[in-house]
């Protein structure tokens, strides 16, 4: 049996190397994540965000515009959208999160809504100052179960190049 094990091919789960990102490609992250009341209250209290629209059911029931429901914390929504992308894109291959731009929340999330995420590779370039690494710009989109966009953010990441690649910069696609 050990001889069979030695001969089998093994693949370790990981994100994408810099070279594997395709500019313009949309990566769909499944399954989605149903947002629960417990998730929202825990995240909201852990981050010291005491807004009653997240925590106070009675107060929220008296506010116009949301049907008396409490809103899911938008930072939880953003964190979950990024989190849903990790196993497919950046697991073990990201060096650093360089920053977010263009963050928006066009529609609210409520307890019981399911969040689905997708990520588009906007651009990529080999790092001029960090050999063996590249900068990948990603656009994350979160949608609820009805397909409504509830979160959008553009993120710059520093990603490892494939250790087996040449590393001479010839993989730069010129975008960015």
Regions found by a protein language model. Give the residues of each.
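HotDog/MaoC-like acyl-thioester-processing domains
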Residues: 1-23, 105, 109-114, 118-176
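Hot-dog-fold acyl-thioester-processing enzymes
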Residues: 2-98, 164-176
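Generic structural detector for well-ordered beta-strands
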Residues: 28-34, 104, 156-158
């Amino acid at each position: 049996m050990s001889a069979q094990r030695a001969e089998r091919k093994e693949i370790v789960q990981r994100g994408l190397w810099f070279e594997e990102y395709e500019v313009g490609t949309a990566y769909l992250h499944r399954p989605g994540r149903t947002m629960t009341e417990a998730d929202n209250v825990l995240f909201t209290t852990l981050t010291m965000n005491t807004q009653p629209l997240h925590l106070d059911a009675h107060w929220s029931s008296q506010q116009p515009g949301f049907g008396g429901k409490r809103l899911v914390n938008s930072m939880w929504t953003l964190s979950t959208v990024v989190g849903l992308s990790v196993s497919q894109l950046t697991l073990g291959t990201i060096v650093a999160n360089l920053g977010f731009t263009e963050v928006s929340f066009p529609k609210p999330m409520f307890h019981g809504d399911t969040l689905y995420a997708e990520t588009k590779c906007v651009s990529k370039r080999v790092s001029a100052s960090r050999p063996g690494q590249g900068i990948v710009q990603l656009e994350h989109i979160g949608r609820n179960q009805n397909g409504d966009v509830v979160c959008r953010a553009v993120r710059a990441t520093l990603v490892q190049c494939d250790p087996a690649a040449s590393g001479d910069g010839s993989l730069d696609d010129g975008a960015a």
